């Protein structure tokens, strides 16, 4: 966020505030760390920021290093920088500058910490986060240095508790979080052990007043060591030599009698840990109070979630293909690395320029907004948002065509002649699901699974062919061929009654509300329970558009802003609003059509815009044969850009009294009542898998979206900041889009896109079976390749990697980025500690596995592979990585 005072000036201002506090300080040693806050954008277009880092900024930092060389070693200038910008500097700096930078790294004047940059961790996924540590690891290894044991996040107020799990399992010992000075902070101690869902504990220093810390400790600081982080403002670079010396002298002045040395965050950890500090343990997730900003780019967010899976599924598929006897014709690891980097950059916390900077238009609404936009006054700021979206577009261009080609090559390689469809399962357990192939080729009435001999029915509608693919091996494939044989099928349970507006299958019976185009009743036929709360203020499967009032945006700003009101209100409130009242709108009087085929029954609701809601949109509700889920698809056509604060939701009010909620968040399933740290976001958050809504008997309903991670419980949560909110009603709201941020996220949402949602019943709740497994199967659909012609030489079916425990994920299987060989990474998500047997494909050449941490460092004794399998004990929610030897 924009500050009207430089980082160094802020540091010196804080100095005067703490001077009176430090006379009786017990501190014997102060480690001074210098850093600048890195935004990929915000102060300028991101390309310009990247250029400046590799040119003027690093040259200025080298100058400060050179001028300090005559000082004692512990007084020489040392500059801490994140992994990714240092990677950019090394790759883009001029040759002579690059050599100087490399030498400064080896000499310890440039210090690279473990994380790539400040991220909104909640927007990411498990494997992209792991890969994001690779930039710093590679730089350290190239310089012959140990891997960094320190890490830093700045600006973003709160983070997913995946951080202590991930960093600890990567060998990192210390994390510093510096909060934006205007934003509310989680209620945590200054220094504490942060315990992750796997019970890993990470020493964490949370400073709520600014990016860095104060130059001297507060009065109640109980330790002999203090960390003074002098962090200059957004992209402002390293201090000059004169500023550097002034800052160090200021620290000495404020800590009389203490030894003051310039160093790293790791130096602070290594010193204070010798004191055996008595620290409070905080076990809890801290939902991000900024995370709603990602849903200002709903299409890109949807694609990012797909790419977070498909990118690493591609590498696993390529690795397996080599074992099966067909090496890829393309450099798959290089494509994966570039896609992973783009995903990381999308998860980086900066989006674009801010309206408050005055560099592109100003806040206007209605006709005035349309006029300014037509004249091009917003072109500069809109391009900055486009830069952010291009990271996702770039990954799509890399990954999606390669996945398509690889699947076609697999289909061509199998020893089956003629038309054939190959179905690949990217998950490490056998599964069944429906697949879709688009082809104009002629097919007979059924398909045969070559491996099992099963005959399955097909539905062919012009160029769209669908069928149920059963018994697809874990991370393996099966081949299907056209046949004239009749499929043996039981009587269909699919039906609809247009007059009564009803449809059903074996598992569910749905009755629609014709007036509102929503679900009036949804019966879970297995439990005979009604899912829908008919008395709710919201309808089930209802699209809701909110237009907020100035009273609401102002209340949010007053609740959330903790300091700097004069500038922070412009970036966290919404200026120039008039007194137009709050409005909540939904479509009505939909056109309803039903259809049925051998695999599904569908109701389509089409809504035309009117004076109350100007959007044209549709809702599609589908039940499938032999599939215990309800599919809901929302689709909007030509949404206009709207600068007025707004949000769109799909509501699901469930018929449960006194509900319990289970949220499948990043790294673990959590209880929002017990596991959220106060002061973080209790009103709105992201999920990674799914949601459970349970009654007192641990029975109820599950739901997820592969496209929409943002949701609120009980009531819609945009423009709300609550310190003690506890959801009471069994309502789940998925956030389709919003433009709440007035800072640097996209400020108006427009266009056409879709979002899917899935609902199922829960009989006996367990994290794995109720949430993780169904959600992962939805996020990782079966992959299909089609070809025709001569047969290849590869088997018609092959097994891949399997795990004995469903819900243990294989997040990576491919080339070791930290050394020789291949790596396989498991991640326990069932929330239970148990042994897990991992079975590798036939014909693999691996003899043993070497346990390692998330950065490839060996951690234990080799484990022999016997009969293509090895067994390990994995703790609940823990990652486990192995080098295959």
Ranges and model annotations:
Residues 9-10, 163-168, 182, 188-190, ...:
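C-terminal (or distal) subdomains of carbohydrate-active enzymes
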Residues 21-127, 131, 140-143, 280-283, ...:
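N-terminal catalytic cores of secreted or lumenal carbohydrate-active enzymes
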Residues 26-31, 37-40, 318-448, 460, ...:
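Histidine-centered catalytic/metal-binding microenvironments
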Residues 78-85, 179-182, 188-192, 221-302, ...:
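C-terminal domain-boundary segment and adjacent tail
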Residues 120-142, 202, 206-219:
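Alpha-helical scaffold elements lining the catalytic groove of polysaccharide deacetylases
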Residues 130-169, 217-231, 870:
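CE4/NodB-like, metal-dependent polysaccharide N-deacetylase domain
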């Amino acid at each position: 966020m924009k500050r009207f005072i430089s980082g160094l000036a802020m540091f010196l201002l804080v100095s005067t505030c703490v001077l009176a506090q430090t006379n009786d300080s017990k501190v014997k040693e102060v480690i001074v760390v210098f850093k600048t806050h890195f935004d990929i954008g915000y102060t300028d277009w991101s390309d310009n920021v990247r250029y400046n880092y590799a040119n003027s900024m690093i040259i200025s930092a080298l100058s400060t290093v050179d001028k300090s060389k005559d000082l004692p070693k512990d007084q020489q200038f040392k500059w801490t920088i994140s992994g990714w910008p240092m990677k950019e500097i090394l790759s883009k700096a001029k040759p002579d500058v690059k050599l100087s930078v490399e030498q400064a790294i080896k000499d310890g004047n440039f210090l690279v910490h473990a994380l790539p940059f400040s991220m909104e961790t909640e927007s990411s996924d498990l494997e992209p986060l792991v890969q994001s540590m690779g930039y710093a690891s590679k730089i350290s290894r190239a310089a012959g240095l140990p891997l960094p044991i320190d890490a830093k996040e700045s600006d973003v107020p709160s983070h997913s508790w995946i951080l202590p799990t991930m960093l600890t399992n990567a060998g990192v010992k210390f994390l510093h979080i510096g909060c934006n000075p205007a934003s509310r902070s989680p209620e945590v101690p200054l220094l504490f052990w942060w315990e992750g869902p796997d019970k890993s504990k990470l020493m964490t220093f949370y400073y709520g007043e600014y990016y860095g810390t104060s130059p001297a400790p507060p009065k109640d600081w109980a330790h002999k060591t203090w960390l003074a982080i002098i962090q200059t403002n957004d992209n402002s670079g390293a201090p000059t030599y004169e500023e550097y010396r002034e800052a160090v002298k200021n620290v000495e002045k404020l800590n009389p009698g203490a030894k003051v040395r310039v160093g790293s965050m790791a130096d602070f950890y290594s010193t204070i840990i010798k004191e055996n500090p008595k620290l409070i343990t905080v076990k809890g997730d801290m939902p991000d109070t900024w995370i709603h900003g990602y849903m200002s780019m709903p299409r890109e967010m949807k694609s990012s979630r797909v790419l977070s899976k498909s990118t690493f599924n591609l590498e696993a598929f390529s690795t397996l293909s080599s074992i099966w006897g067909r090496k890829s014709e393309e450099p798959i690891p290089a494509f994966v690395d570039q896609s992973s980097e783009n995903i990381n950059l999308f998860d980086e916390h900066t989006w674009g320029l801010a309206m408050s900077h005055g560099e592109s238009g100003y806040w206007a609404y209605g006709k005035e907004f349309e006029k300014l936009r037509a004249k091009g006054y917003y072109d500069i700021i809109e391009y900055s948002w486009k830069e952010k979206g291009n990271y996702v577009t770039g990954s799509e261009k890399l990954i999606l065509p390669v996945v398509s080609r690889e699947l076609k090559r697999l289909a061509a390689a199998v020893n089956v002649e003629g038309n054939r469809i190959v179905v690949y399962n990217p998950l490490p357990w056998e599964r069944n699901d429906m697949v879709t192939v688009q082809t104009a080729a002629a097919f007979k009435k059924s398909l045969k699974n070559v491996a099992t001999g099963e005959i399955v029915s097909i539905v062919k509608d012009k160029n769209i062919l669908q069928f149920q693919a059963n018994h697809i091996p874990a991370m393996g494939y099966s081949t299907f061929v056209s046949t004239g044989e009749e499929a043996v099928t039981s009587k269909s349970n699919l039906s609809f009654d247009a007059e009564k507006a009803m449809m059903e299958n074996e598992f569910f019976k749905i009755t629609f509300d014709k007036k509102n185009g929503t679900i009036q009743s949804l019966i879970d036929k297995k439990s005979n329970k009604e899912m829908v709360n008919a008395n709710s203020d919201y309808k089930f499967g209802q699209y809701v558009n909110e237009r907020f009032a100035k009273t609401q945006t102002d209340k949010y700003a007053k609740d959330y802003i903790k300091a700097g009101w004069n500038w922070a209100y412009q970036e966290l409130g919404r200026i120039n609003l008039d007194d137009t009242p709050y409005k909540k709108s939904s479509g009505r009087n939909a056109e309803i059509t039903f259809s049925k085929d051998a695999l599904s029954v569908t109701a389509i609701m089409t809504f035309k815009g009117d004076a109350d809601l100007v959007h044209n949109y549709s809702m599609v509700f589908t039940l499938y044969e032999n599939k215990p889920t309800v599919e809901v698809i929302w689709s909007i056509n030509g949404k206009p850009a709207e600068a007025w604060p707004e949000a769109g939701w799909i509501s699901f009010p469930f018929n449960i009294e006194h509900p319990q909620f289970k949220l499948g968040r990043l790294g673990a399933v959590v209880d929002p009542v017990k596991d959220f740290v106060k002061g973080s976001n209790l009103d709105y958050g992201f999920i990674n898998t799914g949601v459970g809504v349970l009654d007192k008997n641990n029975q109820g309903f599950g739901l997820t979206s592969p496209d929409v991670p943002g949701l609120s419980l009980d009531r819609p949560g945009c423009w709300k900041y609550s310190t003690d909110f506890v959801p009471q009603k069994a309502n789940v709201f998925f956030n389709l889009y919003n433009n709440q941020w007035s800072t640097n996220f996209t400020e108006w949402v427009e266009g056409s896109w879709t979002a899917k949602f899935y609902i199922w019943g829960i009989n006996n709740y367990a994290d794995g079976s109720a949430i993780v497994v169904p959600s992962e199967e939805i996020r990782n659909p079966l992959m299909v390749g089609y070809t025709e012609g001569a047969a290849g030489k590869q088997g018609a079916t092959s097994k891949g990697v399997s795990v004995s425990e469903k819900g243990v994920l294989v997040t990576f299987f491919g080339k070791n980025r930290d050394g020789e060989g291949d790596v396989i990474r498991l991640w326990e998500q069932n929330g239970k500690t148990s042994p897990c047997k991992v079975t590798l494909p036939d014909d693999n050449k691996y003899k043993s596995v070497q346990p390692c941490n998330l950065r490839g460092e060996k951690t234990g004794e080799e484990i022999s592979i016997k009969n293509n399998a090895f067994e390990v004990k994995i703790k609940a929610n823990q990652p486990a990585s192995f080098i295959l030897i």
